[in-house]
Each structure stands twice: as C-alpha cells, then as structure tokens.
C-alpha cells in the first residue's frame, strides 16, 4: 500500500465552519510520520462569502457546482463527495466533515486499521443536541465553532480513546483506497431506503 493520503472536507455556506476545518487540517494533528498527507477543501455550491474566504487561505481547494442545483440536498451532497473522491490525486482518501475537531493521533489510529478491505471510521463525540448513532458518544464541548472548548475536548478525547474496532458505526472520518471507492460504484446519490424507511438520516446517522 502506497503511504499517501488526502484528507478532504466539503464546505457550503459557513465561513465560521470553513475557518474551523481549515485550522484543523493545517494543524499537526493532520500530519503523520512516514506518510505523505495532503489536505483539500471542496466548495460545494458555495456562497460568494465562502469562496472569497477560501481565496485568502493557504490550502488547496476545488470548486464543485452541481449539475442539478434544484435536486434534493442529500443527492447533491453525495454527488459532491463522489466528485471529491474521483478527483483526488492520492491513492488513499480520508473524508471528514467541516464541523469536526480532531483528537491527537486520530489519523494514525485510523491508518492502523486501514487494510484495503475494511473501511475504518473514527468514533464520534457529538454534542448531544441530536441522538448519536452506533458507538457514538454524547459530550458537549461546544455546538458551534465559536463555542468550542478546545482544552476540554483535548482532555476528554484523551480520556476516552481506545485502540479497538467494532462493526458498524458512523460514516466519517473514514479512510479507504481511491481505486476501491471507484470500483465500488461510489456513494449512492441521496438516501438509501429499506422497506420504505430511510436508513440514513439527514444528520448522517446510520440506523
């Protein structure tokens, strides 16, 4: 396995969240010895304010404009993720959300379990505003970029971290090989239904 990976986040309309994920991606938390780690932000039908801010930041970015701008938003989101994966110039990809703050060694711990077969995902700690999904933890360190208590987060994440794996769970951050992502047919567009019931809620929790 070639030791290169690109961490990719989407951004839509929030300059605050853009600044948050920019600071996280540019931090030492997204560096790992022995790996070539790239970072990129994909502007997903982004607002002029977001695009102007991106131009000011020292980070690679690409602009995606959906061919069906009036389509259901989840369909557009997953088309953008597919675009992000297909256009990556790296052999391995890690998708993250723009509202995420990373813990120490999060990336190296994910890569320990990246075997080219399974898709490892990080355990999420969420604020508790909405019910968390499988293996998720509810603990409030702030519910917006301006409210985040980084010191509290660092202490709490260090306290609960474990080097173990479980089946299922939430869907990002996740690591996979680009070639396998393409060979799989990419993400389906929008929600997946079973017996008429959506399996993916709008906030991204697999039931």
Where are these regions (language model features)?
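Conserved donor-nucleotide/metal-binding helix-loop-beta segment in metal-dependent transferases, i.e.
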Residues: 105-121
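A short, conserved alpha-helix in the catalytic core of glycosyltransferases
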Residues: 110, 168-176, 180-185, 191-207
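Short, well-formed alpha-helical segments that are part of the catalytic scaffolds
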Residues: 14-29
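Acidic donor-binding segment of Leloir-type glycosyltransferases
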Residues: 25-69
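A recurrent flexible, glycine/aromatic-enriched loop bordering the glycosyltransferase active site
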Residues: 78, 153-178
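Short beta-strand-to-loop element that shapes/binds the nucleotide-sugar donor at the catalytic cleft/hinge
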Residues: 120-140
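Glycine-rich, basic loop-to-helix element that forms the pyrophosphate-binding segment
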Residues: 67-88
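Short aromatic/hydrophobic "clamp" motif used to bind/position activated sugar donors
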Residues: 93
């Amino acid at each position: 396995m070639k030791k290169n990976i690109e961490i990719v986040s989407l951004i839509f309309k929030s300059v605050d969240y853009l600044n948050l994920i920019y600071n996280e991606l540019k931090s030492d938390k997204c560096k790992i010895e022995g790996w070539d780690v790239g970072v990129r932000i994909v502007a997903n039908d982004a607002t002029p304010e977001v695009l102007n801010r991106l131009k000011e930041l020292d980070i690679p970015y690409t602009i995606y404009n959906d061919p069906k701008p009036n389509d259901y938003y989840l369909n557009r989101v997953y088309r953008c993720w597919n675009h992000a994966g297909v256009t990556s110039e790296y052999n391995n990809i890690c998708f993250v959300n723009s509202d995420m703050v990373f813990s120490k060694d999060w990336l190296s711990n994910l890569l320990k379990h990246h075997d080219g077969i399974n898709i490892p995902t990080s355990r999420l700690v969420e604020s508790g505003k909405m019910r968390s999904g499988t293996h998720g933890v509810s603990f409030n360190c702030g519910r917006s970029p301006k409210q985040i208590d980084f010191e509290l987060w660092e202490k709490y994440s260090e306290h609960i971290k474990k080097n173990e794996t479980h089946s299922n769970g939430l869907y990002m951050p996740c690591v996979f090989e680009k070639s396998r992502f393409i060979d799989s047919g990419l993400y389906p567009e929008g929600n997946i239904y079973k017996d008429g019931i959506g399996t993916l809620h709008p906030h991204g929790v697999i039931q």
